């Protein structure tokens, strides 16, 4: 049941983050979500957490979207498989950030492979996943206000220490997600023969 977790506009949060990441990679021009500094403290916190995540896990995560060999026909299935694998051990804020980074990476890979229409679809899938599968956890964990307190500007040192624990298992989950994606690709290849 999705209610309080989506009190801040989930679609605006996703659009801002994806736009921000696409602009970092030089893919999007002109005004739109993700351009310039975020006025909303939640958007600022998600951008900062995403940047930190990418810095910490660059080697593990860098080519995940490319390794999935996404096509317009397989994109939603791959998105769901990786997202489900990511949260298999239960949600936490670190995994939620990884979900945002993965979604943005999938959007960037779509643009890179000239499949721009997938960008809007991936954002829709992200919003739906957040609002149907993660909303209750977000709400029970203090909502987006708690996320902003943990990851936003001026966060207490204690919050940073707690956050370190959330990042610890993300590398293992991402490695598993890459392996799952590779197995699905190999399985699909052999099934088509």
Curated annotation (Swiss-Prot):
Keywords: Acetylation, Apoptosis, Membrane, Mitochondrion. The modification N-acetylalanine is found at residue 2. One of its GO terms (cellular component) is Bcl-2 family protein complex. SMART domains: BCL, BH4. Coiled coil: none annotated. It is found in: Mitochondrion membrane. Induction: By Igf1. SUPFAM superfamilies: Bcl-2 inhibitors of programmed cell death. PANTHER family: BCL-2 RELATED, BCL-2-LIKE PROTEIN 2. This is Bcl-2-like protein 2. It comes from Mus musculus (Mouse).
């Amino acid at each position: 049941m999705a209610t309080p977790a989506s009190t801040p506009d989930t679609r605006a949060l996703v659009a801002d983050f994806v736009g921000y990441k696409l602009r970092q990679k030089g893919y999007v021009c002109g005004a739109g979500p993700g351009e310039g500094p975020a006025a909303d403290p939640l958007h600022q916190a998600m951008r900062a957490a995403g940047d930190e995540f990418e810095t910490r896990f660059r080697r593990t995560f860098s080519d995940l979207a490319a390794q999935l060999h996404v096509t317009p026909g397989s994109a939603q299935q791959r998105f769901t498989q990786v997202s489900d694998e990511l949260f298999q051990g239960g949600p936490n804020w670190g995994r939620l950030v990884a979900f945002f980074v993965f979604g943005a990476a999938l959007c960037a890979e779509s643009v890179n492979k000239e499949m721009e229409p997938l960008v809007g679809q991936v954002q829709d899938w992200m919003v739906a996943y957040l609002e149907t599968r993660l909303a209750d956890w977000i709400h029970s964990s203090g909502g987006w206000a708690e996320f902003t307190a943990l990851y936003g500007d001026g966060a207490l040192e204690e919050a940073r220490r707690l956050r370190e624990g959330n990042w610890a298992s993300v590398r293992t989950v991402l490695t598993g997600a890459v392996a799952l994606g590779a197995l699905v690709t190999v399985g699909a290849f052999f099934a088509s023969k």
